[in-house]
């Protein structure tokens, strides 16, 4: 017998600080874009935060007279959010596995500037152990700054052929 809707307890938020979220990513400084996981539910959604600093190297030349955070870096932050949710929903990457971006369709509608706190709300569209599709909305102060639909593929390095590194 299930509880009536009014008797169900709301799900507690699950969060991660910077130190813990780094354990889910292979990226290291200066390529870790996320600062915090605000909430997540495996197989369903993740909500992450990125604080944009005026000291970010990418802003030095983009643009000197009026700093605008590059959309390519926003896409990387979204990808990192997806990588974390993908692993939380399936399993951690094995030592010889990587995630590759399969496809991206994005639209950015407002500039992101130093001092902005960007919230990424990423929702799972479909999920398999080796493939993940998602949609994401990026906001600053509750206003949309961009939307993205994408996919990730989990691959073993051995499956990708000989490597030059």
UniProtKB/Swiss-Prot annotation:
The active site is at residue 62. It is an enzyme of class 4 (lyase). Its EC number is 4.2.1.-. It comes from the Bacteria. The keyword tRNA processing does not apply. Keywords: Lyase. Pathway: Phytotoxin biosynthesis; coronatine biosynthesis. Pfam families: FabA. One of its GO terms (molecular function) is lyase activity. PANTHER family: 3-HYDROXYACYL-[ACYL-CARRIER-PROTEIN] DEHYDRATASE. Belongs to the thioester dehydratase family. This is Coronafacic acid dehydratase. It comes from Pseudomonas savastanoi pv. glycinea (Pseudomonas syringae pv. glycinea).
């Amino acid at each position: 017998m299930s509880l009536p809707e009014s008797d169900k307890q709301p799900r507690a938020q699950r969060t991660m600080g910077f130190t813990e979220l780094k354990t889910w990513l292979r990226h290291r400084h200066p390529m870790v874009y996320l600062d915090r996981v605000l909430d997540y539910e495996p197989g369903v959604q993740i909500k992450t935060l990125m604080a944009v600093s005026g000291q970010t190297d990418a802003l030095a030349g983009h643009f000197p007279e009026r700093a605008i955070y590059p959309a390519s870096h926003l896409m990387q932050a979204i990808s990192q959010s997806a990588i974390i949710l993908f692993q939380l929903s399936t399993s951690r990457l094995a030592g010889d596995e990587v995630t590759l971006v399969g496809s991206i369709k994005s639209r950015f509608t407002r500039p992101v500037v130093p001092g902005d706190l960007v919230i990424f709300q990423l929702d799972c569209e479909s999920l398999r152990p080796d493939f993940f599709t998602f949609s994401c909305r990026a906001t600053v102060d509750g206003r949309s700054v961009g939307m993205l639909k994408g996919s990730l593929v989990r691959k073993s390095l051995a499956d990708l052929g000989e490597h030059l590194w």
